[in-house]
Amino acid sequence: DALPILYTIAQTEGCLVAGTGNRSEISMGYFTKWGDGGYDINPIGDLTVREVYEFLAYFNAPQSIRTKKPSAGLWEGQTDEGELGISYDEIDDYLLKGVATSAVKQRIDKSLKITQHKKKLIIYPD
C-alpha cells in the first residue's frame, strides 16, 4: 500500500521513486511486482549482493549494516536466503562467474524463467 503514497509524494515534489533491489534479488524474482519492484530508477539494480557489500565497505558504512543478513523483514528471524533456499554467495557466483553446482544452476535458471513476467513492462494490445 506504500506505492501510491510514494508516487503521490514524488508527483507533488517533482521527483522519481527510487528502488533498492539488487541484481541478485531481481534475477531471482525476489520482489513484489507492484510493491518493492515498483520504482522509476534503481541505482543499485545492476549490483549483486556481494557488490553491494563491497560498496558499503568501500564507503565505510556502519558495521551493523555491513554484517546484517539480508531480510525483507516479513517476520521475526526471516532471511532472504532462508526463503530462497539458496545463498547469495551461490547466486552471485553464478551471475558473476557462471560457476555453480548442478542443483544451484537448476534452481537459479528456474527462478530466472518463472519470474520473467516481473521484469517486463505491462503488455497490452496494440
Regions found by a protein language model. Give the residues of each.
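ATP/NTP-dependent adenylation/nucleotidyl-transfer catalytic domains that generate, transfer
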Residues: 4-126
